[in-house]
Amino acid sequence: MFGLGGQELVLILLIVLLLFGAQKLPELAKGLGKGMKEFKRAQNEIEEEFNKSMDDNPKKEKATTASKS
């Protein structure tokens, strides 16, 4: 995961704990989880739209080449 080892992750967690305090960590984690969920949803929508447009493209090309013949 991004080239981070266990020690680096523990260090980052300790820094976050010091910056935000133990009371804010659940709220921070909840917000981060919601943000990641929203990002994945948007990513899936974009991927589906791209695949859909790629599937529609050959059909349009076949129709135009057939009419040119």
From Swiss-Prot:
Which molecular-function annotations from GO does this UniProt entry contain? protein transmembrane transporter activity
Chain segments carrying region Disordered: 47-69
Q: Which Pfam family, giving just one, matches this sequence? A: TatA_B_E
Q: Where in the cell is it found?
A: Cell inner membrane
Q: GO CC: one term?
A: TAT protein transport complex
**Which regions are flagged for Basic and acidic residues bias?**
47-63
Membrane-spanning intervals of the chain: 1-21
Q: Does the keyword Iron apply?
A: no
From what superkingdom does this record's organism come? Bacteria
One of the protein's GO biological processes: protein transport by the Tat complex
Kindly state which keywords UniProt assigns to this record, in alphabetical order: Cell inner membrane, Cell membrane, Membrane, Protein transport, Translocation, Transmembrane, Transmembrane helix, Transport
Asked if the record carries the keyword Ion transport, the reply is no
The membrane-topology field of this record reads: Single-pass membrane protein
What is known about what this protein does?
Answer: Part of the twin-arginine translocation (Tat) system that transports large folded proteins containing a characteristic twin-arginine motif in their signal peptide across membranes. TatA could form the protein-conducting channel of the Tat system.
Similarity-based family: Belongs to the TatA/E family.
The record's NCBIfam families line, in alphabetical order, gives: tatAE (TIGR01411)
Subunit and partners: Forms a complex with TatC.
Q: What is this protein called?
A: Sec-independent protein translocase protein TatA
| UniProt source species | Chlorobium chlorochromatii (strain CaD3)
What's the encoding gene here? tatA
